[in-house]
Amino acid sequence: MAHYITFLCMVLVLLLQNSVLAEDGEVRSSCRTAPTDLVFILDGSYSVGPENFEIVKKWLVNITKNFDIGPKFIQVGVVQYSDYPVLEIPLGSYDSGEHLTAAVESILYLGGNTKTGKAIQFALDYLFAKSSRFLTKIAVVLTDGKSQDDVKDAAQAARDSKITLFAIGVGSETEDAELRAIANKPSSTYVFYVEDYIAISKIREVMKQKLCEESVCPTRIPVAARDERGFDILLGLDVNKKVKKRIQLSPKKIKGYEVTSKVDLSELTSNVFPEGLPPSYVFVSTQRFKVKKIWDLWRILTIDGRPQIAVTLNGVDKILLFTTTSVINGSQVVTFANPQVKTLFDEGWHQIRLLVTEQDVTLYIDDQQIENKPLHPVLGILINGQTQIGKYSGKEETVQFDVQKLRIYCDPEQNNRETACEIPGFNGECLNGPSDVGSTPAPCICPPGKPGLQGPKGDPGLPGNPGYPGQPGQDGKPGYQGIAGTPGVPGSPGIQGARGLPGYKGEPGRDGDKGDRGLPGFPGLHGMPGSKGEMGAKGDKGSPGFYGKKGAKGEKGNAGFPGLPGPAGEPGRHGKDGLMGSPGFKGEAGSPGAPGQDGTRGEPGIPGFPGNRGLMGQKGEIGPPGQQGKKGAPGMPGLMGSNGSPGQPGTPGSKGSKGEPGIQGMPGASGLKGEPGATGSPGEPGYMGLPGIQGKKGDKGNQGEKGIQGQKGENGRQGIPGQQGIQGHHGAKGERGEKGEPGVRGAIGSKGESGVDGLMGPAGPKGQPGDPGPQGPPGLDGKPGREFSEQFIRQVCTDVIRAQLPVLLQSGRIRNCDHCLSQHGSPGIPGPPGPIGPEGPRGLPGLPGRDGVPGLVGVPGRPGVRGLKGLPGRNGEKGSQGFGYPGEQGPPGPPGPEGPPGISKEGPPGDPGLPGKDGDHGKPGIQGQPGPPGICDPSLCFSVIARRDPFRKGPNY
């Protein structure tokens, strides 16, 4: 029990630390967390029907899933109405989205007439009026027909109570004037129409955005003739007070601010964006600058200075960066590098506009769309840091620049209405004209002109087409009671319902029988003084308690539970003898104290009956070796732990004997394609042979026995490169070889790391008490504990007692407090052994067990089944060009034709004649016999090898 209380105290300390972090602002603020009272008023009349009402419930579930439900965040209430309103879900009834979803799905359809005004008044009186939270209050009215009572007075009363009203009309039976009377102004923001209930899903995202704007963007920015929800960042950072110098933009009487490096434009984010930002918004800024460095026009930082959202201008690369949060890795950066972005750095006035949605961000410069980039889903922002404008990236130094406008609009549609009229020389459309810094433009009011002259009478028109069928009439009165129907077939059992509300406190139960003696109690605080109790039975001697810190003298009270060990206190004066305290827990070994006085010898107690066998205790700390005890009974086998992480390679074991062939295993998965083998060394030059005829497929050879692996040989000398042989023909595909015998058993691996702790097993039966062992020597001094203040310990233990005492009292371990009395009575007669008590609550997880002994070598596993046929190998490299010897010279040609007879008279020798023409080609000679083996010319071999490049594709010339 003491360990259990200590464990709970440690857990509470950690929870207190975490709660401090949460209170310091470590909560992401967004629409999900903005505190809001949100009430849905649903039409449940006859015209809706059960099927359409189910569609409405699914739509309501999809809307509320976007919010965090709880007392600190959004609370949802639901009212269904027909002839009368019904409170289906009160505000604050559920603290989680799952419970709220289950409650919405369990709402039953009413049916009846349409009394919308009565339902609005009911929500005002019984939901909003009973909410004690001073925050945003929103009501959404969904109806499909004209109300049968007045709605104006009830809606006006709700608006007077600062309740924002949305009206959703479904179908053609709704009246536009009635919906406008219900909703807030302007109706373009607070009134929605859909053609039927199936189409209601089309306005889900728009409705979610509008609800978000109401809860996150409470302020309004004057824009032309209407006020837009959003944030004027210049106003939120008090720029008009911090920056004294104003500048004139143009003759249009538009003024701006000249920011210097001496001004610090920073403010706490919680003051500027108290509830964070909506998921979709429009960022607009108008500025002029000359700086050529990287700086942040606007940024929201965490408490440790990390940017969450930022608009960064890179004057070096002339690009724009947008930083925002991300659910993937916390942050994401989008780069706009379009050539048109460079115009921002020409030292002139320009407007930057970023349309940020949940899917993407779009950049506009001077009212022209530049680029669109996708976004990952975003997170809410942390509001415990600062919001700044005009700072160098990563620094606190202010940039010198001029600024005229810096705003965030919560409505994405404002992107279509925004203009850049404040920029000098802007040629775009300016419907409402520019506005001055800090001024509110007046709406344009134009008086109507004079009536024109009456026109001539027109010709008679053609007969009109037949009209459309008339609209359905109003809901009829309830019909007469019908004849009782036959009993239906028993339905199938329904699904288990949601958990019910806590029941009322029951009547006090009768006094129970006296139970078995309980375990020693846990430490408690000093109680109030009580009346003197009756003489109780003498209790057993308890174990000594911890030495507590000396406390202030208090009033006399009843004996409390033993206290927790406290730090050693200063030596105090000798006080009076106190009352005998309750037995405490065994304390840690302390320093030897002064010899005490001899106490009186106690009376010997009556031997008790042998008790039942106790439960297995928790593992204690390792003490010094004790005396050899008796052999204990074998323990219960533990649960199988999870696989440990792979151990380090073990030392190679001795070669085992050859095992028997294993049983044929299951087919293994197809193996991966192997890497190409290394290129072999060139062989010796071969003879020049003729291409041989492809041989027949050979018979399948027998599987040879596996040889013993030889020792690694020494590296041989590098041989002379051989001549490349001619490329051979592709051989026929060989048959699949037989299965090999199983391999030799591998060496025993080293011991793996300890497995993950197993789950706590069920409590075993109560065992017999063992023989008491000899008392061991005192343990070593423990490490000094962490210092906690006495007030902190009291607070933690008070919380523990409040939370755990009712559970312990109901668990059956403590039936009464007879054993807590401190008076000594006469020893009672030992009672018979009590029955085995009920199974106790599940204990805390046990301490990790010792590392197990390495197991024996397992039996060799079955060999895997032969793998699937591998993919065809790569084509081999083309061989180098072969060479042959020149052929033998052919035989001489036949003699030419006989010339004409010469002159008989001998003349002088003539000049040499011209060379004769080549004779006809002779027939090829007969193939000669192969010559003897040639001798390789080293120069020729080198040239062949040099031409052979294994990485060259194509022939080698």
Curated annotation (Swiss-Prot):
It is found in: Secreted, Extracellular space, Extracellular matrix; Cytoplasm. Gene3D superfamilies: 2.60.120.200, 6-Phosphogluconate Dehydrogenase, domain 3, von Willebrand factor, type A domain. Residues 451-462, 471-481, 618-637, 705-729, 839-874 have a biased composition (Low complexity). Residues 448-786, 825-938 are annotated as: Disordered. Residues 448-500, 501-542, 543-594, 681-733, 734-787, 825-882, 884-934 form the Collagen-like domain. Residues 230-412 form the Laminin G-like domain. Induction: Stimulated by PDGF/platelet-derived growth factor. Residues 1-22 form the signal peptide. It holds the Pfam family Collagen. Residues 507-517, 732-742 have a biased composition (Basic and acidic residues). Highly expressed in lymph node, jejunum, pancreas, stomach, trachea, testis, uterus and placenta; moderately expressed in brain, colon, lung, prostate, spinal cord, salivary gland and vascular smooth-muscle cells and very weakly expressed in heart, liver, kidney, bone marrow, spleen, thymus, skeletal muscle, adrenal gland and peripheral leukocytes. Expression in heart was higher in the right ventricle and atrium than in the left ventricle and atrium. SMART domains: TSPN, VWA. Glycans are attached at N62. This is Collagen alpha-1(XXI) chain.
